[in-house]
């Protein structure tokens, strides 16, 4: 289901909330006849927080498969997705996203979804250093600049991810990181 999260995200050290009510498909790519897509959604599976909905739409069969990615009590938001295998025929996806709650500062994370729609454990790409507090009003803008790019023709699966985190000056910091994995073996 496609709906807007009810509450904005909390952040450690400050009562100001992070705006997550920008609900729309955030990222897509097309490979092997499948449209891969991701967006933010509320789901009761992780409490009253936002999660990431990741889907695969098979164009030829017109079938859709979904999975929800989150952690109890944590807001996961603003996903960016990309094919993550050295084998073009393999439907592995890397998702980078932003995370926050009242026990952590806003940070950048990533995980992989395999061909069977199973998610790996998420990894911390960049920890937040502090809370964000520089906007006007009760909420801080969040998630405007999350991105991902694949390095094509690489021996290993390789992507570059970009996201924002809380800097020590209480503003947003930008972070760019390379993520690689061991090569997939042909069937």
Describe the role of every protein-language-model region.
Residues 1-186:
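C-terminal PAP-associated
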């Amino acid at each position: 289901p496609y709906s807007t999260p009810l509450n904005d995200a909390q952040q450690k050290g400050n009562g100001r909330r992070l705006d997550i009510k920008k609900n729309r498909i955030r990222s897509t790519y097309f490979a092997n006849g499948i449209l891969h897509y991701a967006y933010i959604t509320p789901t009761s599976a992780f409490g009253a927080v936002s999660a990431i909905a990741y889907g695969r739409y098979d164009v030829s069969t017109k079938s859709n498969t979904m999975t929800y990615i989150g952690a109890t009590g944590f807001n996961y938001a603003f996903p960016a997705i990309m094919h993550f295998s050295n084998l073009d025929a393999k439907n592995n996806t890397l998702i980078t996203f932003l995370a926050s709650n009242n026990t952590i500062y806003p940070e950048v994370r990533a995980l992989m979804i395999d061909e069977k729609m199973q998610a790996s454990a998420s990894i911390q790409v960049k920890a937040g250093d502090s809370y964000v507090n520089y906007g006007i009003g009760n909420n801080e803008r969040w998630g405007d600049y999350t991105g991902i790019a694949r390095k094509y023709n690489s021996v290993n699966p390789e992507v570059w991810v970009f996201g924002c985190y809380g800097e020590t000056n209480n503003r947003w910091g930008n972070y760019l990181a390379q993520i690689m994995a061991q090569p997939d073996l042909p069937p």
